Amino acid sequence: MTLNLLTAISPIDGRYRSKAEPLAEYFSEYALIRYRIRVEIEYFITLCELPLPQLSSFDKSLFPMLRSIYETFTVAGAQRVKDIESITNHDVKAVEYYIKEQLDAFSSAGNVPAGYFEPYKEFIHFGLTSQDINNTSVPLSIKEALEKVFYPQIEELISQLESYADEWKDVAMLAKTHGQPASPTRLGKEVMVFAYRLREQLNLLKSCRFTAKFGGATGNYNAHHVAYPEYDWREFGNRFVSEKLGLEREQYTTQISNYDHLGSIFDAIRRINTIIIDLDRDFWMYISMEYFKQKIKAGEVGSSAMPHKVNPIDFENSEGNLGISNAILQFLAAKLPVSRLQRDLTDSTVLRNIGTPLGHSVIAVQSTLKGLRKLILNSAALQRDLDNTWAVVAEAIQTILRREAYPHPYEALKALTRTNTKMTEAAIHDFIRTLDVSDKVKAELLAITPDNYTGI
């Protein structure tokens, strides 16, 4: 069966491909190969810049040509790497052989004299193990995917929420705690709660460190040191990882990354996802309470049986995708830091799944935005609930009575309002008029309504 949108096993690459497609530049097999080539080339260039004695004569003007191997890398190039891997049965070794092929191709094309690269080719992947390539490529891909795709989408969501918060800043709304009426609030402020929370957690995510393992077969630069003991390979590795890749080298590792900082990143993304789940559920409830209507698109169907249905499907889609994302992120954060002795292979297949939770997250964010942009404020419904729930001003009345040293104000209001009888404006006002307080205080109390008792 040919792979396409209809035959893909994962909905990320099938039904939702258009929403997740930007992540293919960072987490596809093609992308991983390109990142590996990038790390290998930049490492070779850094060895030339050192320079190692055998690389001192390498023409530095050829560096742009070397970088073009990954900068112009195509899917066809990735297929060639896979063809090599079918023989080597080793993905990183296939990358090394591919780069050497490209060097030969430069010679064949006349870009350099025939045989020019022969003295230098064995310094491709010099002294490295596969994880020096993987544990730099993967964090680099995550860093750039977050910067180019995830951060902008969360910023867009925050911006939309802030816009609504401003638009609805003066819209009074009955609050609900434990599902029951509580002191009134303002719709704009409740929306701003989510914008604030997302901003806080986005800043925490951005503060996470993107670290990489780069230190040879067991993290000690054994091969580098035995070949060139006169060089400070720790300093070299720190500089290479920082300056060429924009990452931070982990100073003590086994064969693989410690993955502790990746765990922090996954946990930070999960917190953002969780806030959006909370947002999705709240707006789902507001729609159910008729505080919002939804824009209707001609031709769309809400139910195969009930013609009238206009369902909050975007918020539901988002919530479902975020649940999947969080489950995988939690697993990644718990599994990756654990590896037997100096390394087992369990991290290898797990790392290939990092794009999956991020895919579900970006699908979810777009669904939430779509849902938010369908909303039509139903002011009448908000006003109806306020008008029908005068008991919520009891807090205001008892607090002012406390200020006035009135005896047992809380108990008096409790006796009045904590019943199964509906509390009306008239009942509240009749109660106020019986109070033994000054006319000024009575006027102050009579001015309180569910509409204006919304705090600051």
Q: Could you tell me what each predicted segment is?
A:
Residues 2-29, 65, 71, 301-456:
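Catalytic-core signal marking the mid-to-C-terminal active-site face
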Residues 2-221, 228, 232-240, 302, ...:
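A helix-coil-helix interface module used to build multimeric assemblies
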Residues 42-47, 98, 102, 145, ...:
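Generic, well-ordered alpha-helical scaffold segments in large soluble proteins
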Residues 143-151, 155-158, 162, 192-195, ...:
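Short amphipathic alpha-helical segments with heptad-repeat character
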Residues 166-169, 210, 284, 291, ...:
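Alpha-helical coiled-coil oligomerization motifs
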Residues 201, 248-250, 254-340:
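Glycine-rich anion/phosphate-binding loop at the beta-strand->alpha-helix junction
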Residues 205-214, 283-293, 423-424:
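Short conserved catalytic/interaction loops centered on acidic-Pro-aromatic/His motifs
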Residues 231-255, 259:
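Active-site-adjacent "gating/activation" loops or surface patches in catalytic cores
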